[in-house]
Amino acid sequence: MKITALEGQKISELSMIEVAHALLEQNGKEMQFSEIIRAIQDYLEKSDDEIKASISSFYTEINTDGSFIPLGNNVWALRSWYAIDEIDEEVIALDEIEDEEEEKPAKKRKKVNAFGIEDEIDPEDEEGTKETTEEDMSYDTQAEDEDKDDVAAYDAELAEVELDNVDEEVDIELEDDEDDSDDTDED
């Protein structure tokens, strides 16, 4: 197989993308990806193993290279064969479809109770909206009264306890906490 655009160049120095571009240009029509690979393999005289090793990188290059365009069904062509207007029209058509979809009113989402209990009231949902009632206050007042009763009972027990050797004086030495806090800082 001869590719006239590549005559005079060393075959070993050519990339698969260059050969694919020249091949499509010479044929003047779109080609299946598998046909392009076979033609490149024949032209570059590569073995099946070499082609298999480089086919994934070639496919990536042909997709990212701006000079090729996929036509669907694994058929490829040169982008220069197609007028820019044709490509833009396809994009505009897609934009119009998206615009039509946006014009439809969006459905309102309904809140769904994941637990399936419709009548259960969650007190956290109503936090801050509920006024304090006498029942709420009575619990707090009752707890305070119980605390006062406990303190009074404790004081009464202390008064009943007889202290041994009350006459002896006990010396209690108080230490400065400031000195201790300086000693504990190791920074």
From Swiss-Prot:
BP-aspect Gene Ontology terms: DNA-templated transcription; regulation of DNA-templated transcription
Entries under InterPro entries matching the protein: Asxl_HARE-HTH, RNAP_delta_N_dom_sf, RpoE
PROSITE patterns: HTH_HARE
Region Disordered, annotated ranges: 96-187
Keywords, comma-separated and alphabetical: DNA-directed RNA polymerase, Nucleotidyltransferase, Transcription, Transferase
Acidic residues compositional bias, start-end: 117-149, 157-187
Organism domain of life: Bacteria
Biological role stated in the UniProt entry: Participates in both the initiation and recycling phases of transcription. In the presence of the delta subunit, RNAP displays an increased specificity of transcription, a decreased affinity for nucleic acids, and an increased efficiency of RNA synthesis because of enhanced recycling.
UniProt xrefs under HAMAP family: RNApol_bact_RpoE
Oligomer and partners: RNAP is composed of a core of 2 alpha, a beta and a beta' subunits. The core is associated with a delta subunit and one of several sigma factors.
Protein's UniProt name: Probable DNA-directed RNA polymerase subunit delta
Higher taxonomy: Bacteria, Bacillati, Bacillota, Bacilli, Lactobacillales
Gene name tied to this protein: rpoE
